Structures are given as structure tokens and as C-alpha cells.
Amino acid sequence: QMLSALAEELGGVIEESECVLVSMLAGVTLERLEALFPGKRILRIMPNTPCAVGSGMLFLCRGSLAAEQDAEAFRQLMACAGRIDEIPEKWMDAASAVAGCGPAFAYMFVQALADGGVECGLPRAKATEYAAQMLLGSAQMVLQTGAHPEKLKDDVCSPGGSTIAGVHALENAAFRAACMDAVTAAYERTKGLG
């Protein structure tokens, strides 16, 4: 309802403009946007909060009238935000659930690791710093090596060692299932927003 009212209010201004309309409205499809703004070049995007520090993930899909040059201009404008991936629109809600909502899940993980560090005697600030840097470095290992996360995990686990004991504790707590459930719940909610 609010989107329809906004489209009505802005319609005249947008009609007279040669601008590219960029939407980051979660769950609002290109089809709906093109119906509200007929004849306009539209890009649908979804950034995540780490874009604010240049390490984000931003998804982009083009409407039927948007040209490659429109997408390229947007990519150049937003290059400082982090990685940009042009994807099929059918992936947008799932990609948003993983990378758009994922930072909240990552922050919870960093906080939980820091809490564990505090329980083991580390000062809070140091435990948080170590957990955050570990997550940053681990993410870079995945991106730069191209190795499967399972292999990278196994590389850290020595037989009978402390890491495999911690992995066992996470498996007993259904860590992976909880992460998958979080993404699925976010995806279902996003689909319902449109």
C-alpha cells in the first residue's frame, strides 16, 4: 500500500526523468516495480550492512528495460561497497537471506565466541577482537583459496585435538541446523514482504 502511494506521489517526477530507478525494497519484485513505474529502467538491489565499511555483499538484478550500461554504471558507483554480484531475480530473496541477514548471525557468532573467551579468562575487548579477526580471516580463506569450507574445517582439526572437541560440541548443539533454520526463516519472511 505504501509503495503504491509513493509511486503515485513520485510518478510525475520520475516520468519526466531519464533516471534509472534503483530499488532496495525487500521482497518487491521487478515485475511489481515495472507495473508501478512503466517505461522506466529499473535495477533491484540488496546490499548488506558491511557495505558501510567497504566489505559488503551487494546483489543486483536488472529490469526488462535496464541495459548493461545501467548495471555497469551502478557497479562503478558502488564498487567501494565491496563485492557486487548480478544475479537472476529468482535468487534475490535467498541471496538476501544468506548475505543480507547473515551479518546479524555473524555478529551473534562473534559475541558467542567472545562470551566463551571471557568465561575462559580473556578480557571482553580482547575476546571480541580475536573472534572478529578470526571470522574475517576465515572468510578470506574461503574466498581466496576456493576450498570447500568442510576441507578448511578439517585442516584445522587435528586428531584428538581441542578443535575437534569444539566441533563435536557444536554438532551436539545442532549448530549447522540452527544456521540453516535461520537462513530459511529469513528467506520465508522476505518472500512475504512483497
Where are these regions (language model features)?
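Hydrophobic alpha-helical segments typical of transmembrane helices
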Residues: 2, 29-32, 105, 113, ...
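Short pre-catalytic strand/loop immediately N-terminal to key active-site residues, enriched for Gly-Thr
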Residues: 42, 92-97, 149-154
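Rossmann-like NAD(P)(H) cofactor-binding subdomain of soluble oxidoreductases
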Residues: 1-60
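Glycine/serine-rich anion-binding loops at beta->alpha junctions
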Residues: 46-51, 96-106
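Internal alpha-helical scaffold of NAD(P)-dependent oxidoreductase catalytic cores
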Residues: 32-41, 57-95, 107-144, 189
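NAD(P)-dependent Rossmann-like dehydrogenase/reductase catalytic/cofactor-binding core
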Residues: 132-194
